[in-house]
Amino acid sequence: MASEDIAKLAETLAKTQVAGGQLSFKGKSLKLNTAEDAKDVIKEIEDFDSLEALRLEGNTVGVEAARVIAKALEKKSELKRCHWSDMFTGRLRTEIPPALISLGEGLITAGAQLVELDLSDNAFGPDGVQGFEALLKSSACFTLQELKLNNCGMGIGGGKILAAALTECHRKSSAQGKPLALKVFVAGRNRLENDGATALAEAFRVIGTLEEVHMPQNGINHPGITALAQAFAVNPLLRVINLNDNTFTEKGAVAMAETLKTLRQVEVINFGDCLVRSKGAVAIADAIRGGLPKLKELNLSFCEIKRDAALAVAEAMADKAELEKLDLNGNTLGEEGCEQLQEVLEGFNMAKVLASLSDDEDEEEEEEGEEEEEEAEEEEEEDEEEEEEEEEEEEEEPQQRGQGEKSATPSRKILDPNTGEPAPVLSSPPPADVSTFLAFPSPEKLLRLGPKSSVLIAQQTDTSDPEKVVSAFLKVSSVFKDEATVRMAVQDAVDALMQKAFNSSSFNSNTFLTRLLVHMGLLKSEDKVKAIANLYGPLMALNHMVQQDYFPKALAPLLLAFVTKPNSALESCSFARHSLLQTLYKV
């Protein structure tokens, strides 16, 4: 490190915050690669008496630097809180596990008794969980109360490793007469899916002391939701349940409602964008009506809830004296339904708790496709049953053919809206309209476009116009989820759209990328374009796109330059950003 760099580092460290047993290097943007780089940080740690909290967020720590920092921590037995989120920016994923192992060993050697461990926004993936697995199983974590692992990309494998480590920690600590009493668990945006969530649910059942669980955006469907619900039932101290942007459907919502009936301490419920639908909302309303006396906030926004179900939810709030917010935005109440909802709450003197209904869909518009929606709901509920019976059907089919019968597409009956008579239809719901999807994109609508969705979207888009291609790309990528079926549908649509565009001689690739950066808020523009709010989907779609043969490699340096620049919107999607950066470095 050059002498001027050392002087700059020393100046930065001089501004280090020290308060109440806490040593903070938060947001200093320190690049600690070698032992020499970390020399002054180590001195600060060594000279700090009674160190209880160490903040390393917003810096980047390499393997060698982590090793010497860990050595300094070996003498800090009073350390209780490790705020170590976002401290591996720009590191290869292979660097992170050994760095975490070293830091963990330092804490174990010190005999620390941790209360809080925050490793959020470190894109370490499943392998990274192995980096702190030994720490979680050690006596240093027998006293752990808060574990925060938001946006780490753990995946199913990482979720299982984490669950096993927590279970082992509880077993070992119980043997010493002081069972692990974890209170706060945060693991949003980790691609846990059903298997990862189910494994963690088993650990939660063993622990039984949880007060807050935050697991939004994990691609969890009703089997995983049901497992979590059963685990929550044996955690009677739960106050906050945040499962935003997973997929409950009616089955998951009903299971969760049964658990809510048994809990008395719940204050905050966030099931927004969870597709609980009307029947699920009614079940939750019934659970709330009979309990949850301390409820302060309920979020059921964007859940495809209709008017009557929404009114049932509102009516369940009658005796909730502590209620501060009820969010039913983005459902299908219609103008009249919104007015009725407000009237119900006004009758309870609770009008002020109702969140905005600005994104509500008109009920009349919804009724036009009501039969199609109901059919889709029935189909989704039958999916699991069909999967379970698939093997039996495959065994029966050869026998039927042997009897001279032709294989046919399974059909079922629904009522004809005009005659009221049963009308045979294919078991799959009618495909959604491409223009409807592009106007109001959602994962469900994309899947309902069917196997030709990618071709249809590409055909619908004028690929000679970069602005229109940007618009289509952002709408498709906005519905990206880590759930396998949605992820593949998004990637296929992106491939069809962008291959058609980039292969066109009239398409201006540079203009496309420039306009894309503008719409993502990464490049300023004179036309004052409103940047999209969430970059996770577009970043994940870009990560896929830049690896394809059709992508002009000459665009990679420009994209890399803008994704590398500091940006608050990018920082909130650190896993997706880190993954894209790793890919771009290889292009």
Swiss-Prot record:
Key words of the record: Acetylation, Centromere, Chromosome, Cytoplasm, Cytoskeleton, GTPase activation, Isopeptide bond, Kinetochore, Leucine-rich repeat, Nucleus, Phosphoprotein, Repeat, Ubl conjugation
GO cellular component entries: aggresome; axon cytoplasm; cytoplasm; cytoplasmic periphery of the nuclear pore complex; cytosol; dendrite; intracellular membrane-bounded organelle; kinetochore
Cross-link Glycyl lysine isopeptide (Lys-Gly) (interchain with G-Cter in SUMO2) mapped to chain: 8, 15, 279, 452, 524, 586
Positions occupied by motif SUMO conjugation: 523-526
Cross-link Glycyl lysine isopeptide (Lys-Gly) (interchain with G-Cter in SUMO1) placement: 8, 524
GO biological process: activation of GTPase activity; cellular response to vasopressin; negative regulation of protein export from nucleus; nuclear export; protein sumoylation; response to axon injury; signal transduction
Residue ranges, compositional bias (Polar residues): 400-410
N6-acetyllysine: modified positions: 524
Site for Hydrophobic interaction with UBE2I, residues: 562, 565
Domain of life of the native organism: Eukaryota
Similarity comment text for this entry: Belongs to the RNA1 family.
Record-given protein name: Ran GTPase-activating protein 1
Organism in which the protein naturally occurs: Homo sapiens (Human)
Name of the gene: RANGAP1
